[in-house]
């Protein structure tokens, strides 16, 4: 009679969350920061191209940034007066010049100003590691930049700019100045690679026993 096979799924479930256990427990209760992305927001009105400043938010790792798009209730204004924006994530030069072509990429689009359920909301989580194959990873002690542009064929609007500073921590020392774009072909940070390399030999030994 063949020996009974050992169930591997419970073991995998025990091994894979190891990295999550190493995260700072003090950040278990993350903060949320709201940004209302419209030109009537006075925080944006101090932002002039070339001044190097503008709307700034300070966050910590595992915090959330909630972007609220422009929204209009009844009676609705004329369509040409409704604000619509395409939001980009850019580098420092793109933020200073309000030019999304400076290593910028489209992040969100505020294209439903009269949505019946309320304003569109987009959320960014500032995390060291992401479980998603197309997620972004952020580093403490660095700044990240967002700007908006008017969609084509619409009335041009002033550029709105946002700078997010991720506060440094005592436990992490990273030098990556830009958000890391992850894919299925790479490990999400050194912790993920180390976990994978240490887990594989254990699984092979169990399969061969």
UniProtKB/Swiss-Prot annotation:
Keyword Transcription regulation (UniProt): no
Glycosylated residues (UniProt): 38, 170, 184
Listed CDD domains: Ephrin-A_Ectodomain
Tissue distribution of the protein: Expressed in myogenic progenitor cells.
Residues spanning the signal sequence: 1-20
Any one GO molecular function term: ephrin receptor binding
Pfam families found in the cross-reference section: Ephrin
Main location per the UniProt record: membrane
Top-rank taxon: Eukaryota
Bridged cysteine pairs (disulfide): 69-110, 98-159
Propeptide stretches in the record: 185-209
InterPro entries reported for this sequence: Cupredoxin, Ephrin, Ephrin-A_Ecto, Ephrin_CS, Ephrin_RBD
PROSITE patterns cross-referenced by the UniProt entry: EPHRIN_RBD_1, EPHRIN_RBD_2
Occurrences of domain Ephrin RBD (ranges): 30-170
Membrane topology reported for the UniProt record: Lipid-anchor; GPI-anchor
Keywords annotated in UniProt: Cell membrane, Disulfide bond, Glycoprotein, GPI-anchor, Lipoprotein, Membrane, Signal
SUBUNIT field: Binds to the receptor tyrosine kinases EPHA3, EPHA4 and EPHA5. Interacts with EPHA8; activates EPHA8.
Family: Belongs to the ephrin family.
Protein name as catalogued: Ephrin-A2
